[in-house]
């Protein structure tokens, strides 16, 4: 078995300074693996084809090299920064790309920053020993320039932009998010079953509904859903061609929203605990400064349970990260197209969690929303507010 690093470790990466960091991967059982970086060397034995080395805190620096070797094989990664690493977690509004925000024309041409890096955890929806859906190629860490920035999280970019200009420290952003996801997608079965109401609403009801579903039935439902989405996209394109001056909020009011949710099934990325395994577990041992958690829109239908659900997410992630990592909770903004009038309830739950759970901090985004658009295009203001919260917490 070849020596490998976990996918998140590539040239151009950013490692967290000032705390222990984990380097991990796979290889041949019983071989010795040695790593060297910033003058530090550490060795471990590969057990059951897996290895992990924890290094003492590294100092802020640039242009470092990581060497990983078994003696028979060597991996060398270059152009590594040591700075602060932030996880961008949740659903579509933290995933929302820079190229789609309303400030793209103003800021794109002046965005180049070799000390700002971005890693997107591949959005694997389903995998087993035979298949991976979709078969996404790992892009590795990207340096911020006027091309790569298009696919950065817009909120993440603006947070990093303000940090870089105010604090002048290398910044790494790790996107571990996917649009349309409930908090229940991001925790494991043990945590989903800790609370009986959460278990009933999020876990039992889902899997009971697909208990007798065949793979052929699921594939048929997926095909039907994809056709509905295609027809909707055609309507949107025609509307934008006819009314180019109208904004997205007006479009959503007139045309309606993207067909949602998709069909349930074992390959549905919205299944309980699904993305916990296919995305979060791949990077949970990577050391970082804080988690930016912007999520909740999908859970407004069960807003009365969100207080418990969000607590479970935080507990589960901290357990897996083996750290009391701070959570910066981005509170949902105003939104008028809430048929159940549940958004205020969920906002209250977010605030309550930040009052009760240690090292959880709220960022208020009221007046950043749009009347009928669940994906407001002003991400610069939200990124700036997160920056101010983080600055007062970690840098003042």
Positions of predicted regions on the chain:
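Cell-envelope and extracellular/periplasmic
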Residues: 1-396
């Amino acid at each position: 078995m070849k020596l490998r690093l976990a996918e998140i470790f590539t040239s151009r990466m950013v490692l967290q300074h000032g705390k222990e960091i984990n380097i991990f991967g796979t290889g041949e059982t019983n071989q010795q693996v040695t790593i060297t970086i910033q003058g530090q060397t550490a060795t471990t034995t590969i057990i059951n084809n897996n290895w992990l080395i924890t290094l003492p805190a590294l100092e802020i620096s640039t242009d470092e090299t990581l060497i990983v070797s078994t003696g028979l094989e060597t991996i060398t990664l270059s152009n590594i920064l040591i700075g602060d690493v932030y996880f961008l977690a949740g659903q579509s509004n933290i995933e929302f790309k820079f190229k789609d925000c309303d400030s793209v024309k103003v800021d794109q041409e002046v965005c180049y920053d070799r000390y700002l890096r971005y890693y997107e955890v591949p959005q694997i929806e389903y995998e087993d020993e035979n298949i991976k859906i979709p078969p996404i190629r790992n892009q590795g860490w990207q340096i911020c320039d006027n091309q790569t920035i298009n696919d950065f999280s817009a909120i993440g970019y603006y947070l990093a932009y303000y940090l870089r200009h105010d604090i002048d420290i290398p910044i790494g952003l790790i996107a571990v998010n996917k649009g349309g996801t409930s908090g229940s997608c991001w925790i494991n079965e043990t945590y989903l079953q800790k609370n009986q109401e959460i278990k009933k609403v999020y876990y039992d009801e889902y899997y009971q509904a697909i208990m007798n579903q065949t793979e052929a039935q699921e594939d048929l439902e997926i095909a039907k859903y994809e056709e509905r989405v295609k027809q909707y996209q055609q309507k949107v394109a025609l509307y934008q061609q006819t009314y180019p001056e109208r904004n997205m909020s007006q479009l959503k009011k007139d045309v309606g929203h993207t067909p949602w949710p998709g069909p349930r099934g074992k390959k549905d990325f919205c299944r309980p605990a699904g993305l916990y395994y296919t995305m979060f577990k791949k990077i949970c041992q990577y050391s970082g400064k804080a988690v930016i958690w912007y999520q909740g829109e999908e859970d407004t239908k069960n807003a009365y349970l969100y207080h418990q659900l969000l607590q479970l997410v935080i507990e589960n992630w901290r357990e897996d990260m083996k750290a009391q990592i701070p959570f910066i909770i981005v509170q949902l903004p105003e939104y008028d197209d809430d048929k159940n009038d549940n958004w205020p309830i969920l906002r209250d739950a977010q605030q309550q969690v930040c009052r009760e759970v240690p090292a959880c901090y709220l960022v208020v985004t009221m007046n950043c929303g749009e009347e009928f658009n669940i994906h407001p295009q002003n991400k610069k203001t939200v990124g700036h507010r997160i920056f101010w919260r983080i600055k007062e917490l970690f840098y003042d």
